[in-house]
């Protein structure tokens, strides 16, 4: 048969299939723009500013609407009330994880980030319990973070106040913390394997947030047949997983069931004793994916947030001066910051919260999926339908945070200058899929940033007003722009 005829037949089949899927899926889904065959609503979505794009759709269709990514319908929740109602009030129904083809390719339904159903529930219970046993929320973990903060200060002092790209140095600190929890290792900041690990984690995150990767997620049939950066992602992920499998093998050979050293040991002990959590997957493959998830989540999210924080603090020198004044008054220069200090440092605490609110690192979180046929606000959402939560619409809500596009710690201070909590503070998402490492991440951000500002003045290479905050990519996550700066030791 003529190749051209074959091509036409294939395209015709895809067109008919797309039309059928779109028509059969609409049912009583929330309203939304009419999708085109094959591409759905992609022609209407600005991937460079999807937050504003979703806001514009919400003005037309309301806080709950449907968009088609290719032939796949995705229900979008916009605004605090809709997201709270779904993730909190209907938490069980919205607790599924959306099918993201590129992620599914590397996780194969294992780990904690992209597993489903009973396996995910059991894995989450195991992870939370084990992190608690290892000192999450206690002095045990705080001591690790404080120790790592001092190693970070030593490394920053080695720059001698000269211009440097902080990406790798800043990334080393949170990566060392999670590595010490997972497999009891902290690395020298020049260790080759350590730098390779961080470099590949950084590169994977950038690729996942690139426009090209979004196309492959929308048209997954292209993944196995087209060249692109996603192949580099798969290669990097294979290296990371192989490296961590090596750590697991070392643990198996030296395991003492009466004296667990770290996260891997706790897993291996339950695996060996066969009296663990019901529905838990105790295969080595599951452990390797779970550990990979923890290393990714505990490294790049913190690193990106801290780099954005450095840019903001250099750009807004009056805010930095207030934070450093509070540090001098409460902590001084001769002891390490601790979490108890946070209760006496409302402005610094507000600054850390405002960094996370302002940068809006994960604009739409990770896609959810309804676990059963669900009635939601008079709409019918069939089991398996994907759900996107616009966290931007909550973090930048102008009623809760007046002038949300302005970086202002006052968003988290009351009239008396005391720190005030906000239910709209959702950088870690909400509900049953909320980040398991939230408390650790909050601790690290406070201690690392406070320790940096206690020891250094931050000097940009350009005029503060010219500092560009525009992310390199803004997809799955926002990637900070490349920049150089100077860390000037405080005398």
Curated annotation (Swiss-Prot):
What is this enzyme's catalytic activity, as reactions?
(5Z,8Z,11Z,14Z)-eicosatetraenoate + reduced [NADPH--hemoprotein reductase] + O2 = 16(R)-hydroxy-(5Z,8Z,11Z,14Z)-eicosatetraenoate + oxidized [NADPH--hemoprotein reductase] + H2O + H(+); (5Z,8Z,11Z,14Z)-eicosatetraenoate + reduced [NADPH--hemoprotein reductase] + O2 = 16(S)-hydroxy-(5Z,8Z,11Z,14Z)-eicosatetraenoate + oxidized [NADPH--hemoprotein reductase] + H2O + H(+); (5Z,8Z,11Z,14Z)-eicosatetraenoate + reduced [NADPH--hemoprotein reductase] + O2 = (14R,15S)-epoxy-(5Z,8Z,11Z)-eicosatrienoate + oxidized [NADPH--hemoprotein reductase] + H2O + H(+); (5Z,8Z,11Z,14Z)-eicosatetraenoate + reduced [NADPH--hemoprotein reductase] + O2 = (14S,15R)-epoxy-(5Z,8Z,11Z)-eicosatrienoate + oxidized [NADPH--hemoprotein reductase] + H2O + H(+)
Q: Name one GO molecular function term.
A: arachidonate 14,15-epoxygenase activity
Q: Does the keyword Heme apply?
A: yes
Q: Which cofactor does it need?
A: heme
Its Enzyme Commission number(s) read 1.14.14.-
Query: Which superkingdom?
Result: Eukaryota
The pathway entry for this protein reads as:
Lipid metabolism; arachidonate metabolism
Give its localization: Endoplasmic reticulum membrane; Microsome membrane
Keywords attached to this Swiss-Prot or TrEMBL record, sorted alphabetically, are: Endoplasmic reticulum, Heme, Iron, Lipid metabolism, Membrane, Metal-binding, Microsome, Monooxygenase, Oxidoreductase, Signal
Q: Enumerate the residues binding heme.
A: 435
Give me the Gene Ontology terms describing cellular component: endoplasmic reticulum membrane
Q: Which residues form the signal peptide?
A: 1-25
Family stated for the protein in its record: Belongs to the cytochrome P450 family.
What is the annotated role of this protein in its UniProt record? A cytochrome P450 monooxygenase that may play a major role in the metabolism of arachidonic acid in the intestinal tract. Exhibits regioselective hydroxylase and epoxidase activity toward arachidonic acid, producing 16(R)-hydroxyeicosatetraenoic acid (HETE) and (14R,15S)-epoxyeicosatrienoic acid (EpETrE) as major products. Mechanistically, uses molecular oxygen inserting one oxygen atom into a substrate, and reducing the second into a water molecule, with two electrons provided by NADPH via cytochrome P450 reductase (CPR; NADPH-ferrihemoprotein reductase).
Q: What is this protein called?
A: Cytochrome P450 2C40
